[in-house]
């Protein structure tokens, strides 16, 4: 079964802001003036250095432009190229790294309005995540309220490594707003760099940074479970984006084991954590951190205990695979269909309105 014939839903596409000038028309005048006066040139995400090989596949790069900055190229290469009927835009412009809560909120508003006008209005296959200023949970919840009426926004986007563990109750206004509107919360690889990306200090190399993101996802997933987010918001879905997933079986076993022995301190977690995670957490497919030949990947998926966990993604334009190999070839046809179509539709209720 070819990936090109199934009409999948790509759950992780990265549109790039070509330059800060593109957002000026969407910024409040106060902040447009501040950009000019302060000489702000761009808000490129440090988590994805512009010229690092990972940031863009060689055949998806364009001389003199940011990979992902052209809507036409993104739709041609990522949607047409893989036969996808729809794609979710996760914009990683570094709004969450700003120290000013008000400035972050202004840029989040501008970025979401830019996505709506320059991307969603111009291709009916595109959907997007709401970028929010995580620096201020009340302002983030306000941005969710502002944008939730536009049904083309199907998710709320947070960075994996922010100022604090994501389960903390100070962040619950974000989850409450998302749950009220039926929006999953997507947690994407990346850091605001308020803290080291490893538990023992700052690394020397980008390789260390990116590899350690998987550990960051495990930390945040533990926080969400143990702090009671899933217990408080039982309808909430969380999607770990670009997290990898092959670490999940061992992680579930460890979390379950120590919950059994220590659950007296977290009585609100009143059922086994693996059960909670299998019901309320999903993972995008790329990167696949396992051999795609042989049965290793199938054994990992079997150990994870559910065929509903994975959502198709290319991670465009990030370089996670070559050619058309976005979907591991040895997966059973029934599982391919679930990853490509059924699981995304079950995770994102708003997609069912147009693509079911």
Which residues does each predicted region cover?
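Helix-coil boundary/capping segments in enzymes
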Residues: 1-356
């Amino acid at each position: 079964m070819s990936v090109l014939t199934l009409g999948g839903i790509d759950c992780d596409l990265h549109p790039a802001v070509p330059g800060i000038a593109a957002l000026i028309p969407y910024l409040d005048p106060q902040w447009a003036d501040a950009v000019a006066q302060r000489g702000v040139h761009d808000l490129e995400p440090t988590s994805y250095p512009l010229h690092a090989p990972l940031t863009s596949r060689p055949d998806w790069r364009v001389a003199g432009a940011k990979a992902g900055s052209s809507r036409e190229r993104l739709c041609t290469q990522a949607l047409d190229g893989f036969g996808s009927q729809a794609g979710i835009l996760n914009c990683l412009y570094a709004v969450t790294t700003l120290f000013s809560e008000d400035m972050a909120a202004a840029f989040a508003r501008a970025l979401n309005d830019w996505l709506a006008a320059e991307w969603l209005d111009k291709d009916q296959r595109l959907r997007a995540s709401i970028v929010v200023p995580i620096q201020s949970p009340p302002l983030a919840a306000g941005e969710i309220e502002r944008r939730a009426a536009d049904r083309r926004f199907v998710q709320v986007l947070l960075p994996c490594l922010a100022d604090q563990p994501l389960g903390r109750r100070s962040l619950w206004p974000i989850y409450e707003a998302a749950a009220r509107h039926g929006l999953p919360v997507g947690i994407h690889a990346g850091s605001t760099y308020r803290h080291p990306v490893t538990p023992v200090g700052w690394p020397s190399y980008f390789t260390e940074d990116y590899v350690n993101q998987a550990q960051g996802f495990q930390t945040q997933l533990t926080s969400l479970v143990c702090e009671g987010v899933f217990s408080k918001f039982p309808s909430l879905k969380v999607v770990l984006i670009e997290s990898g997933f092959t670490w999940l079986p061992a992680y579930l076993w460890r979390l379950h084991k120590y919950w059994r022995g220590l659950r007296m301190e977290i009585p609100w977690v009143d059922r086994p954590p693996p059960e909670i995670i299998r019901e309320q957490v999903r993972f995008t497919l790329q990167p696949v951190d396992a051999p795609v030949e042989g049965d290793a990947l199938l054994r990992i998926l079997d150990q994870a205990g559910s065929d509903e966990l994975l959502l198709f993604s290319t991670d465009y334009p990030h370089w996670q695979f070559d050619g058309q190999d976005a979907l591991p070839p040895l997966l059973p046809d029934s599982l391919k269909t679930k990853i490509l179509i059924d699981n995304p539709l079950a995770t994102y209720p708003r997609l069912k309105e147009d693509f079911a």
